[in-house]
A protein has these predicted regions:
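Catalytic core and acceptor-binding pocket of nucleotide-sugar-dependent glycosyltransferases
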Residues: 107-110, 117-155
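Conserved donor-nucleotide/metal-binding helix-loop-beta segment in metal-dependent transferases, i.e.
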Residues: 82-113
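N-terminal anchoring/stem segment of glycosyltransferases
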Residues: 1-51
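Soluble or luminal CAZymes and related metallo-dependent hydrolases
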Residues: 2-5, 58, 146-151
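Conserved hydrophobic/aromatic beta-strand scaffold that supports enzyme active sites
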Residues: 65, 100-102, 117-119
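Short acidic donor-binding/metal-coordinating loop in glycosyltransferase active sites
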Residues: 51, 78-80
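A short, glycine-/small-residue-rich helix N-cap motif at loop->alpha-helix starts
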Residues: 52-61
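Short aromatic/hydrophobic "clamp" motif used to bind/position activated sugar donors
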Residues: 73-75
Length: 155
């Protein structure tokens, strides 16, 4: 399902997101024929992660892209398809001053961020504020850490 889906998305990206690069994260569980095909596409960058384990944390590899300096990043699952609605909403976001963007694929999706499209630009996750207990009334209530460091703790 995912290998077929990424092929379909790579082909559709040429139509919906002309000029964009599709970054595909994978490990050794993906058939080499699929990887060879992906490497031949002019709109694909393949990112290899060693190993053969199918772990839940593999789904977090995509978040590494959010820390590419000065990049505009859109993320979605390989089993989700692009749509005219999505492209219109992404264009509206790019024309706005907002740094973060979320699209829910269905009106009943109530989780803050699902596998539908989300985007980040202007290095908006370079530093993430984490609430810290107040030691005294004059202390700063938020500690900022590098977003990449926080992500590395979960992968």
């Amino acid at each position: 399902m995912y290998t077929y889906g990424i092929i379909e998305n790579v082909l559709d990206a040429k139509k919906y997101y002309d000029g964009w690069i599709v970054r595909v994260h994978h490990n050794d569980t993906v058939p080499t024929g699929i990887i060879d095909w992906l490497k031949k596409q002019d709109n694909v960058e393949v990112v290899y992660h060693p190993g053969t384990k199918k772990k839940a944390s593999n789904t977090l590899w995509r978040f590494e892209d959010l820390f590419i300096k000065d990049a505009i990043v859109l993320s979605r699952d390989a089993d989700s398809r692009f749509s005219e609605r999505e492209v219109k909403l992404v264009k509206e976001w790019l024309d706005s001053t907002k740094d973060f963007h979320i699209i829910r694929d269905h009106k009943h999706h109530m989780v803050p961020i699902l596998a539908g499209t989300f985007g980040c630009r202007n290095n908006c996750l370079e530093y993430i504020g984490i609430p810290v207990p107040l030691r005294n009334i004059n202390s700063i209530p938020t500690q900022y850490i590098e977003g990449k460091s926080l992500m590395d703790e979960f992968i």
